[in-house]
A protein has these predicted regions:
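Proline-aspartate-enriched helix->loop->beta-strand connector
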Residues: 44-54
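Structured beta-strand-rich core segments of catalytic domains in phosphoester-bond hydrolases
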Residues: 3-16, 36, 53-129, 233-237
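N-terminal signal-anchor transmembrane helix
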Residues: 1-38, 42, 46
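Active-site environment of divalent metal-dependent phosphoester hydrolases
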Residues: 31-35, 58-62, 95-97, 120, ...
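Alpha-helix-centered segments that form part of catalytic cores
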Residues: 146-168
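Active-site-proximal beta-strand elements of phosphoester/diester hydrolases
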Residues: 21-31, 109-118, 141, 175
Length: 253
């Protein structure tokens, strides 16, 4: 039990030998401001994922061979190789957004939830320590003051997202940018009753956001207990955003 919080950051799960039949990728693309639309779209297509989750995607989310899509929502979008039979925006507050989509796959239906919780608005200089104690103390107070309203927004957002998870008649996959670390309220509430796929099959580091001095984990993939995870990895070979893509494979019978 004591090792679990550490394993949410660094984990060495045994390799699963079963062959997957579902592959997903989730990526906060930062409005394509770093990698550019073409390179990001090319990368996502080359992953050959069955379902692509994108956050902060902008409007140029054009990827060939994905006939089914949800691009009518602000900030969050999805591409699927198989049919989307239902989709619905989930009420959010602030600058966050989320939706669910029910997708036909391998003779059954799964519900996927794409999450982008309201971001914390910090300038890098606000969280950078300095030598002066009083200045650091003032910085901490200012950061805490800014945290409280965002936490309240997250509570509202999560309540609506949980409704889509809890009421689902189908197995569920939740993926996206939670803008929260693994020991947070957001992690526990959105993951309640689900499996953290990194804990199940992840190997190495789970950190996905690399824009600060120390990388942190704020991108996640959770799944229902009857969906079997096969693999999970953070792709650090590309720097097309301030987030690394997260890729997971599953076996759905």
């Amino acid at each position: 039990m004591l090792l679990t919080p550490i394993r949410r950051w660094i984990n060495w799960s045994p390799t699963v030998s079963e062959k997957p039949n579902l592959k997903i990728v989730t990526m906060n693309v930062k409005g394509s401001a770093i990698g550019g639309h073409e390179k990001i779209n090319e990368y996502l297509q080359e992953t050959n994922a069955d379902i692509i989750f994108a956050q902060e995607y902008g409007r140029k989310f054009n990827i060939a061979n994905y006939p089914y899509k949800t691009d009518q929502y602000e900030i969050v979008a999805l591409k699927s190789k198989t049919e989307i039979i239902k989709q619905e925006k989930l009420a959010t507050a602030g600058n966050g957004n989320a939706f669910y989509a029910d997708i036909k796959f391998n003779g059954q239906i799964i519900r996927v939830v794409n999450v982008y919780l309201n971001p914390f608005s910090f300038d890098k200089q606000e969280v950078k320590p300095v030598e002066d104690f009083q200045e650091n103390k003032a910085k901490v107070k200012d950061v805490v003051r800014k945290l409280v309203p965002t936490f309240k927004i997250h509570q509202e957002e999560i309540a609506n997202i949980r409704k889509a998870i809890d009421s689902s008649p189908y197995p569920v996959i939740v993926a996206g940018d939670f803008n929260a670390v693994p020991n947070s309220y957001e992690y526990y509430e959105l993951g309640r009753g689900l499996k953290d796929v990194f804990l199940e099959v992840g190997r190495g580091s789970s950190t996905s956001f690399h824009d600060y001095k120390f990388p942190i984990r704020i991108d996640y993939i959770f799944a229902s207990k009857d969906i079997k995870p096969i693999s999970y990895r953070v792709d650090r070979t590309v720097r097309l955003s301030d987030h690394f893509p997260v890729i997971a494979e599953f076996k759905i019978d």
